[in-house]
Amino acid sequence: WDFAVQARGHHNTEKLGDNCRLWLEKHVLGEKHFWPGRPQSIIKLDSKGVPELHLTPANQAEIKELQVYQCLKTSNNIARFWRDVDSVRQGNTWVAKLPVMNVDDYVFSYANIRYQNDCVLSSGFEAVIPSNLGKAVATDKKSDLISDGTGQWSHVGPAEGVGGVQGFRPLDNRRGTRNIQFSDPKWKAPRESKLSFRFYCTQPQKVVLSANRRFTTDLEITASNDWQSMTLPAKQLLSHGVGLSDWSVADSISIMPKPGSDITKVVFAEFKWVE
């Protein structure tokens, strides 16, 4: 048996190659398509106590690309935020560092392996508590800066505003943009913090910012030839008249245009948590 899972996917499979056609033609029609063997994987501690994924794929001469993913803490697969992780090949094994913030919390990891014929396989899902493996160390740190460049915002492209400040511009005026990285403890808001960001727009626009899809607030993006900033307390976002209790309970943030506005004309930058 085999499987492939798209990280951060939502019923979409565009990053899973040509699996369906290849599998059906091979196993139903009997055509002679190449199909790789199962990869082997395990999470270990390195010599300094940092967790790392050791991945040994099959049919390595046919590999086109390989991407490792990591998730911290939550055992609820619906709420997981999967980070992209760099890996280094060491002989027949790819090794990826998995930095953690707490050695007594779970770390999860798996990889997607794309082959030359556009078949994509996922490795097994590995889950460990690092302290159970030995003398583990926590090397990751919490970040109040949410977005550097495009960050994890969906449907955006890199953009530069006045003064050379790097940010992002939403590309789809119908879908807007969304960020789901806040279930990761690295980017979860500190209690009683506020959301701050900068924006650059030379034409006035109106947008709706929401948290967890339910709590919303209307924002006026005023026109200016300079960067502007905005700071939002959690209670400003409402759902049926009730304010968001705290930014720390937010797992996702979305920004959508109001009817008649064009969000693609707005450049956003430097989303961060502030006191």
Where do the PLM segments sit?
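Histidine-bearing beta->alpha loop at or near hydrolase active sites
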Residues: 1-14, 20
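Surface beta-strand/loop "capping" patches
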Residues: 18, 22-70, 74-76, 83-99, ...
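Short proline/glycine- and polar residue-rich coil/turn motifs
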Residues: 87-92, 101, 220-228
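Short, surface-exposed loop/turn segments at beta-strand-coil junctions that are enriched for proline
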Residues: 99-104, 237-241
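Short, aromatic- and glycine-rich surface loops/edge beta-strands on solvent-exposed regions
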Residues: 104-118, 251-256
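Short acidic/polar inter-strand loop motif in beta-rich domains
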Residues: 113-124, 260-264
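Short beta-strand elements
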Residues: 118-150
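Extracellular ligand-binding interfaces
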Residues: 161-164, 169-243, 249, 257-267, ...
